[in-house]
């Protein structure tokens, strides 16, 4: 595909900590978080002026789905914009709690597991063409998605009967199938439920649910950018060596529990390879393809070059055992370094409760309390986007995709105080005429029908 539509859906963990331990339940906190949203949107499921969707998911998890983006860097920006929007909800909820004399501090975490062992997700969406063999696409992608955690995992301190261990991925231990149409019951790597949110005759949405939520901007860039490049490889018809794993679910756990990336996993054909070897094979094939053909016969963009550079440096760091070249860019390495410094300073074992609190605090989206955000404020991690672009993304839709039509419509309807209904493909004025515009092309940012609908308000 010359252009691809990307989107990220992030479920956030929520808690209300009180000094006496009697904080509000997650359900109660979620209601406070969404009071303001329900007040103006009459629902806890709304589309925003920036084209994104904000809603309360199953299990009291606030969820933010980015607007459609057609550029990886743009997606990183809108993903971060979601954090800022949710941070605003936290501030409002905190104010309401204090006004009502209720104790406790509300925290939102961009992570994937809670202390009770529940898991919530970060789902990546990639638009692919309907034509082509989706089963082949999935077969080639699964080993890549299982092994990419050595680079883009969020890191996690896991308590085991033999003591605490530092794992690469928060999500790996909660995945039960390679490919399935379910998202919660079996938690597959790729979800096959066919909801393209586009013209189903031409497009299909690849729904990847195995990934961890990322705090570090370069990690998000690599996670989505490398997956896009592998998809382009498949779409170009490049023949890949079969890297199918004998037992994908066992492999994803074993890889997560070995932070060196050197644990050998069994392939379906009887060979054994390490996660780094498998990732290296994908990287080399992608690099060869980009060097030979560019990206769709165009020169690689600065973002593509940055993705390839970080992918290569990450693999070299794992091969050499020296992670210093990526300890400002990859989440699991940034957090590991933070934990190691804290352990050394205070003489702590990995299973100390203070380490668990630090692990969690890394993912707090607060810019004043979240450890990742404090590192970013001090210039201790690398950036992909800017604070100004992130701020703009909270209010303005991406200008190059269907999200602009949706965002402009929502803004106009709200300003005109008109009753309206929107979803990913429909824009509707709830007046006597019930006028509706169907927007099936996610690449289209200009539409005379939408212009007329807005002018009629």
UniProtKB/Swiss-Prot annotation:
Stretches that traverse the bilayer: none
Pathway the protein contributes to: Protein degradation; proteasomal Pup-dependent pathway; Protein modification; protein pupylation
Keywords: ATP-binding, Ligase, Magnesium, Metal-binding, Nucleotide-binding, Ubl conjugation pathway
Reactions that this protein is recorded to catalyse: ATP + [prokaryotic ubiquitin-like protein]-L-glutamate + [protein]-L-lysine = ADP + phosphate + N(6)-([prokaryotic ubiquitin-like protein]-gamma-L-glutamyl)-[protein]-L-lysine
Any Pfam family: Pup_ligase
Miscellaneous comment in the UniProt entry for this protein: The reaction mechanism probably proceeds via the activation of Pup by phosphorylation of its C-terminal glutamate, which is then subject to nucleophilic attack by the substrate lysine, resulting in an isopeptide bond and the release of phosphate as a good leaving group.
Binding site for Mg(2+): 9, 55, 63
Entry binding sites for ATP: 53, 66, 424
The protein's name in its UniProt record: Pup--protein ligase
The enzyme's E.C. designation: 6.3.1.19
Active site per UniProt: 57 (proton acceptor)
Single GO term (MF): ubiquitin-like protein transferase activity
Organism: Xylanimonas cellulosilytica (strain DSM 15894 / JCM 12276 / CECT 5975 / KCTC 9989 / LMG 20990 / NBRC 107835 / XIL07)
Biological processes per GO annotation: modification-dependent protein catabolic process; proteasomal protein catabolic process; protein pupylation
Domain of life of the source: Bacteria
Lineage per the UniProt record: Bacteria, Bacillati, Actinomycetota, Actinomycetes, Micrococcales
Family statement: Belongs to the Pup ligase/Pup deamidase family. Pup-conjugating enzyme subfamily.
Entry annotated with the keyword Methyltransferase: no
HAMAP family: Pup_ligase
Function: Catalyzes the covalent attachment of the prokaryotic ubiquitin-like protein modifier Pup to the proteasomal substrate proteins, thereby targeting them for proteasomal degradation. This tagging system is termed pupylation. The ligation reaction involves the side-chain carboxylate of the C-terminal glutamate of Pup and the side-chain amino group of a substrate lysine.
């Amino acid at each position: 595909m010359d252009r691809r539509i990307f989107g990220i859906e992030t479920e956030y963990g929520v808690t209300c900590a009180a000094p006496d331990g009697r904080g509000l339940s997650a359900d109660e906190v979620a209601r406070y978080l969404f009071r303001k949203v329900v007040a103006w949107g009459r629902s806890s499921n709304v589309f925003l002026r920036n084209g994104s969707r904000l809603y309360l998911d199953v299990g009291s998890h606030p969820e933010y789905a980015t607007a459609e983006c057609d550029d990886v860097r743009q997606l990183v920006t809108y993903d971060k914009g979601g954090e800022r929007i949710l941070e605003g909800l936290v501030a409002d909820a905190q104010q309401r709690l204090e006004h009502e004399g209720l104790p406790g501090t509300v925290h939102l975490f961009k992570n994937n597991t809670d202390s009770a062992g529940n898991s919530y997700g970060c789902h990546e969406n990639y638009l692919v063409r309907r034509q082509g063999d989706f089963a082949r696409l999935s077969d080639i992608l699964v080993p890549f998605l299982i092994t990419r955690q050595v680079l883009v995992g969020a890191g996690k301190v896991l308590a085991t009967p033999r003591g605490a261990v530092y794992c690469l991925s928060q999500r790996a231990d909660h995945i039960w199938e390679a490919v399935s149409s379910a998202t919660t019951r079996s938690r597959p790597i790729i979800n096959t439920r066919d909801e393209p949110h586009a013209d189903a005759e031409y497009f299909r949405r690849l729904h990847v649910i195995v990934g961890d939520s990322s705090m570090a901007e370069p990690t998000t860039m690599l996670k989505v950018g490398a997956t896009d490049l592998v998809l382009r490889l498949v779409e170009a018809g490049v023949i890949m060596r079969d890297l199918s794993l004998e037992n994908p679910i066992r492999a994803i756990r074993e890889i997560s529990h070995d932070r060196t990336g050197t644990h050998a996993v069994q392939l379906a054909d009887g060979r054994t390879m390490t996660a780094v070897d498998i990732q290296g094979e994908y990287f080399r094939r992608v690099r060869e393809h980009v060097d030979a053909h560019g990206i769709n016969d165009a020169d690689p963009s600065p973002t593509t070059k940055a993705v390839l550079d970080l992918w290569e440096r990450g693999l070299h760091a794992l091969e050499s055992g020296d992670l210093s070249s990526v300890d400002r860019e990859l989440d699991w390495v940034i957090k590991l370094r933070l934990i190691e410094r804290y352990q050394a300073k205070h003489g702590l074992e990995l299973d100390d409760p203070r380490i668990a609190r630090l692990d969690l605090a890394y993912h707090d989206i607060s810019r004043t309390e979240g450890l990742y955000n404090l590192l970013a404020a001090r210039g201790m991690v690398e950036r992909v986007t800017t604070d100004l672009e992130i701020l703009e993304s909270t209010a303005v839709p991406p200008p190059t995709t269907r999200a602009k039509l949706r965002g402009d419509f929502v803004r106009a309807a709200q300003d005109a105080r008109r009753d309206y209904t929107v979803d990913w493909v429909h824009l509707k004025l709830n007046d006597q005429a019930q006028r509706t515009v169907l927007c099936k092309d996610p690449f289209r940012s200009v539409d005379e029908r939408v212009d007329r609908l807005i002018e009629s308000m």
